[in-house]
């Protein structure tokens, strides 16, 4: 990929919310150049700190639903179009974001977590398991038994959706009424 395409990719990733570590891994641009680009696009310095590193986050109820949606979109793009990994990733993330925004919801899966998810699949840390009830394919730990797997949509946890934010109130207990 030539330098112009590298810069365009970096700008696109920054606009979508990529962290500096993602940019460094996916482009060949120098760290200094990426920081300058980030400041130009976002108007501030890139955030510091470690990237998410736990695969367990992707297994919890709501993140699992969103991660599964995103990863299935990504796989579909890769398998049907044959476009390169990073382009498929950007297209899949845009489609995921578009799909979630149809319900006026905030995306649970940020771009950096989506990128980490793909890396976990590539490293054989995560896999897709088919739900025995609905037939959907959901993110699960690699090498976990898949026979009789039931997804979080078919069998949500008892407190699913009963958060302060979902209730629109300060007290969670009022959701139970």
Language model segments and positions:
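Long, charge-rich, low-complexity intrinsically disordered regions
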Residues: 1-12, 16, 21-177
């Amino acid at each position: 990929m030539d330098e112009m395409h590298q810069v365009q990719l970096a700008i696109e990733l920054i606009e979508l919310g990529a962290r500096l570590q993602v940019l460094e891994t996916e482009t060949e641009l120098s760290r200094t150049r990426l920081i300058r680009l980030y400041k130009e696009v976002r108007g501030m310095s890139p955030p510091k700190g470690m990237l998410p590193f736990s695969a367990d986050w992707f297994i919890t109820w709501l993140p699992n639903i969103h991660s599964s949606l995103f990863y299935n979109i990504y796989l579909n793009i890769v398998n049907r179009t044959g476009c390169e990994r990073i382009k498929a990733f950007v297209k899949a993330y845009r489609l995921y974001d578009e799909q979630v925004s149809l319900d006026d919801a905030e995306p649970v899966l940020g771009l950096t977590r989506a990128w980490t998810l793909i890396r976990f699949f590539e490293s054989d840390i995560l896999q897709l398991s088919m739900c025995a009830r609905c037939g959907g394919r959901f993110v699960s730990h690699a090498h976990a038994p898949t026979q009789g797997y039931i997804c979080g949509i078919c069998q949500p946890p008892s407190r699913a959706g009963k958060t302060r934010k979902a209730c629109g109130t300060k007290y969670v207990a009022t959701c139970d009424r």
